[in-house]
Amino acid sequence: MLKIIIPTIMLFPVTWYSKNSMIWINTTSHSLMISLMGLLLLNHPSNNSNNFSLNFFSDPLSSPLLMLTMWLLPLMIMASQHHLAKEPWFRKKSYLSMLITLQMFLIMTFMATELILFYILFEATLIPTLIIITRWGNQTERLNAGMYFLFYTLTGSLPLLVALIYLQSSMGSLNLLTINLWLKELPNSWSTNLLWMACIMAFMVKMPLYGLHLWLPKAHVEAPIAGSMVLAAVLLKLGGYGMMRITIILDPTTKSMAYPFLMLCLWGMIMTSSICLRQTDLKSLIAYSSVSHMALVIVAILVQTPLGFMGATALMIAHGLTSSMLFCLANSNYERIHSRTMLMARGLQTLLPLMTTWWLLASLNNLALPPSINLIGELLVTITSFSWSNITVILIGLNMLITALYSLYMLITTQRGKLTYYLHNLNPSLTRENTLMSMHMLPLLFLTLNPKIILGPTF
């Protein structure tokens, strides 16, 4: 545990004491070494958890998410270099400090044993994210996006705190390791239903559930590149992880209470996919596609079967890497043509052929082409939801079709077609960008060879 936390804390002096010319190379290489040390966490000889201390542990569910969090920091630092180029050194260093703080909170959130500690760290991730969005975003609307993000998350999370304090007083402990050993079934009453709602709502807002998703497109569109990456790749996964952890306590109630939410997810999944077909703004399209993918994860978790949990974990990891890569690609377009409108960027295949290769790979992963882990996740979710109700196959099949449509629509609109007349002196694709894309793509390709390390605790 400390072999990850202490080097992460040491990134602060590395950032602030590095020479100005060495800031990027030092932080990137240091954070990459931390993420390689974290690979040891993925080794679970048995299906048990590794208990580092009384407060922190990792198990087959949290270790893939931990690995994703650690892998993302060097990528965010690499992606941010261009848009911070004209900022003064102090601001560059404070931006990096925010990213490192966020990384530290996220690592501890995924490792927490106590649910109250998990809640505190879950809320703490809000602060650095908010500062990144409202300070380094592009347009003035970033303040509005920050307000949405803050109030949606806070309003959703307050009932969870009350519910956790109530559970603590009634059960005596909220330790995740012991709680399922002496768990009493919750009584079947309306107050239990309220407790279930209070516990689940915070994670539903974070995921986000269709209907509570309005903060997500705003936050994604206005955030700088690192903000978008960490938001899509890790912060949405906090919701899924929290739901998997807390549904253990709410055992029999979920079966009856999940119906309206399952309906809403299946409906919202198709709605948000359809919205993607009508988008002109590239970042907004990727944000809405995140909502539709996360709806699948909510379905998988609420059906409450081992296969569902496996599918949800696989889909979360796959989506984390894929959507982060899509945001990087959108950002590399934005740095060249200074517009997020897709039609403005058409015909880039002739100018940047290598970037088109990355666009193709990212789009194919997004539409879950075999044998990607996106497909493995989606298949497991489909099997799970089919066991719950046969009709869901039609809805999930329709969603897969629309996902394929908007992924290819995005690819064709940005890469094919005639060049717009004002694109004549573009920068070529940089080695930094190609490295960044390959570092997103390689884990996705390698995981197709051995997906069981990210299939969670039930494999």
Swiss-Prot record:
Cellular component GO terms held in the UniProt record: mitochondrial inner membrane
Transmembrane segments: 22-42, 60-80, 95-111, 113-133, 147-167, 194-214, 224-244, 257-277, 284-303, 308-330, 342-362, 391-411
Family: Belongs to the complex I subunit 4 family.
Main subcellular location: mitochondrion
An example Gene Ontology molecular-function term: ubiquinone binding
Designated name of the protein: NADH-ubiquinone oxidoreductase chain 4
Functional description taken from the UniProt entry: Core subunit of the mitochondrial membrane respiratory chain NADH dehydrogenase (Complex I) which catalyzes electron transfer from NADH through the respiratory chain, using ubiquinone as an electron acceptor. Essential for the catalytic activity and assembly of complex I.
Source organism: Avahi cleesei
Reaction(s) catalysed by this chain's protein: a ubiquinone + NADH + 5 H(+)(in) = a ubiquinol + NAD(+) + 4 H(+)(out)
Alphabetically ordered keywords of this record: Electron transport, Membrane, Mitochondrion, Mitochondrion inner membrane, NAD, Respiratory chain, Translocase, Transmembrane, Transmembrane helix, Transport, Ubiquinone
Membrane-protein topology: Multi-pass membrane protein
Tagged with keyword RNA-binding: no
Record text on subunit structure and interactions: Core subunit of respiratory chain NADH dehydrogenase (Complex I) which is composed of 45 different subunits.
EC number: 7.1.1.2
